[in-house]
């Protein structure tokens, strides 16, 4: 077995103590790299897999950083970027941390290939699972890798689909697969207008969460501060009333554990 000191990942930053990245006080590790290019991304500097500001560190370094925070933490949450692109490398780290009684969470966009990531899923206690939306508007919202500047186009629903439908649907499919495994802590939806039908999506999520009342739905009203095209995105920000109405609709659909962030 390869030693932790011989496996390296690109690190964006570490927060030793955080109470917003899952249950209890946790250490949060932000890795570099994401296959998506979401227009509302507030950490676009983490999208490239390697940058001058990111450090290439060993798993042993990460393990030691986390262990320094014990006994003041319950576990660790690995975020990004998108942590599942490092799935093979994270498995030995999670095994080592769990052997010390720590829980291991993943903060994920949910667009990973489930079968390829199974070994990491097996050693992950919980997912903080992002829902990006649904339908062809996702192509513009999250999948236009050529739009490096993150400029919001005038036409957000594309006339032609360049992404395969199965890739667009992978988000919900992965959520449906993780729920029976008791692997989901919360589902998060960033709510913005016109890119997708938010009520229709919430209805689908309600069907999935029906038998999992302990899984929270977090509805987050998008904001433009810190995004790459603040002026362009501002036209798609829902009002407080619209956001509260979506939360009320989610409750009407049978979801009881809802957190609305305005």
Swiss-Prot record:
Cofactor binding annotation: Binds 1 [4Fe-4S] cluster. The cluster is coordinated with 3 cysteines and an exchangeable S-adenosyl-L-methionine.
Radical SAM core domain segment(s): 20-262
Keyword S-adenosyl-L-methionine tagged: yes
Entry binding sites for [4Fe-4S] cluster: 34, 38, 41
UniProt keyword terms in alphabetical order: 4Fe-4S, Iron, Iron-sulfur, Metal-binding, Oxidoreductase, S-adenosyl-L-methionine
Entry GO MF terms: 4 iron, 4 sulfur cluster binding; metal ion binding; oxidoreductase activity
UniProt catalytic activity: glycyl-[protein] + reduced [flavodoxin] + S-adenosyl-L-methionine = glycin-2-yl radical-[protein] + semiquinone [flavodoxin] + 5'-deoxyadenosine + L-methionine + H(+)
Entry-linked InterPro entries: Aldolase_TIM (IPR013785), Organic_radical-activating (IPR034457), Radical_activat_CS (IPR001989), rSAM (IPR007197)
EC number(s) recorded for this UniProt protein: 1.97.1.-
The protein's required cofactors: [4Fe-4S] cluster
Binding site for S-adenosyl-L-methionine: 40-42, 81, 130-132
Positions in coiled-coil regions: none
Homology family: Belongs to the organic radical-activating enzymes family.
Protein known as: Putative glycyl-radical enzyme activating enzyme HI_0520
Species of provenance: Haemophilus influenzae (strain ATCC 51907 / DSM 11121 / KW20 / Rd)
């Amino acid at each position: 077995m390869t030693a932790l000191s011989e496996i390296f990942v690109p690190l964006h930053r570490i927060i030793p103590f955080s109470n917003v990245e899952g249950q209890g006080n946790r250490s949060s590790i932000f890795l570099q790299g994401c296959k998506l290019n979401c227009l509302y991304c507030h950490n676009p500097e983490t999208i490239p897999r390697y940058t001058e500001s990111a450090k290439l560190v060993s798993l042993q370094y990460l393990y030691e950083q986390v262990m320094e925070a014990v006994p003041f933490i319950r576990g660790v949450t690995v975020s990004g970027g998108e942590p599942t692109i490092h799935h093979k490398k994270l498995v030995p780290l999670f095994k080592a941390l769990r052997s010390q009684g720590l829980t291991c969470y993943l903060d994920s966009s949910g667009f990973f290939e489930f079968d390829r990531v199974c070994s990491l899923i097996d050693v992950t206690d919980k997912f903080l699972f992002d829902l990006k939306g649904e339908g062809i508007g996702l192509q513009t919202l999250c999948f236009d890798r050529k739009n490096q500047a993150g400029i919001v186009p005038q036409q957000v629903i594309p006339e032609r689909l360049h992404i395969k439908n199965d890739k667009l649907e992978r988000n919900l499919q992965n959520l449906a697969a993780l729920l029976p495994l008791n692997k989901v802590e919360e589902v998060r939806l960033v709510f913005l207008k016109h890119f997708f039908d938010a009520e229709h999506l919430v209805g689908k999520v309600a069907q999935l969460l029906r038998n999992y009342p302990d899984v929270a739905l977090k509805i987050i009203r998008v904001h433009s501060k810190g995004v790459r095209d603040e002026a362009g995105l501002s036209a798609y920000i829902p009002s407080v009333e619209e956001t509260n109405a979506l939360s009320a609709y989610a409750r009407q659909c049978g979801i009881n554990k809802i957190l609305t962030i305005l």
